Regions:
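Phosphate-binding P-loop
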Residues: 19-25
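Residue-level preference for the first positions of well-ordered beta-strands
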Residues: 27-29, 55-57, 114-116, 146
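Conserved Walker B catalytic segment
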Residues: 99-153
Length: 182
C-alpha cells in the first residue's frame, strides 16, 4: 500500500494547463486575492521546472513597501543563485540607470538554461515605477528568462499590457479557483 504524504500539494490538471504558458512568456502576472493559492501554484510550477529543465530559480519575497529592502531581497536572490551582477548595484532611480540595469540583467541571464525570476507579494511594494521597470524588462528579456509576479492587486499599467502583447501571460482568480469537480 502506498504511503500517504500529508504535505503533498494538489494542483489540478486544469490549473497545470493554466501554468504551462509561463514557459513561453516573458512576464506572467498572477493576480488574485489572498487564499487562492498563487504562491502554492507558482512554487509547484517552479519545482517542476527545476526537476525537468534544471532551471535556475530566483525567488524574491516582498515584505513591505520599502524599496531598499526589496532591492536587497533581489540582490540576495541573485547572489544565492551564484549571480553576482547585482552586488553593489544601486536601485535604479532614473530612466537611464533603469535602462542600463535592464541591459545588464539581460546579458547576465541570457543563455540556454531556463531562468525563472519569481516576485511574490508584489502588492506590498506599492511602487508604480517598479511595475513599469518590470514591464520594460519583460520586453527585453531573452527567450530563456521568464519573470513571474504574484500580487493581490492589478499592478500592470494598461499601456504596458498593450506593449507586452503576446509576451504577457495573465492568471487570475478564475484560473486558480478550484471547481466542483476538483
Amino acid at each position: 500500500m502506498r504511503k500517504l504524504d500529508l504535505n503533498a500539494v494538489y494542483i489540478s490538471e486544469r490549473v497545470q494547463e493554466t501554468l504551462r504558458p509561463i514557459r513561453a512568456s516573458a512576464l506572467t502576472a498572477v493576480v488574485a486575492p489572498m487564499g487562492y493559492g498563487k504562491t502554492t501554484a507558482i512554487n509547484w510550477f517552479l519545482n517542476q521546472r527545476r526537476q525537468t529543465e534544471n532551471a535556475v530559480i530566483l525567488r524574491v519575497n516582498i515584505y513591505s513597501d520599502n524599496r531598499s529592502i526589496f532591492w536587497k531581497s533581489v540582490q540576495n536572490a541573485f547572489g544565492a543563485a551564484g549571480l553576482t551582477a547585482l552586488a553593489g548595484c544601486e536601485y535604479p532611480e532614473d530612466a537611464s540607470s533603469a535602462a542600463q540595469l535592464m541591459d545588464d540583467l539581460c546579458t547576465v541571464l541570457a543563455g540556454n538554461t531556463p531562468c525563472y525570476l519569481f516576485l511574490d507579494d508584489f502588492h506590498l511594494l506599492k511602487d508604480e515605477n517598479t511595475a513599469k521597470f518590470l514591464c520594460g524588462l519583460a520586453n527585453r528579456l531573452p527567450e530563456n528568462v521568464h519573470l513571474i509576479v504574484a500580487s493581490r492587486n492589478n499592478f500592470l499599467p494598461k499601456e504596458e499590457i498593450l506593449r507586452l502583447g503576446h509576451r504577457l501571460h495573465r492568471i487570475g482568480k478564475e484560473q486558480l479557483r478550484l471547481n466542483h469537480t476538483e
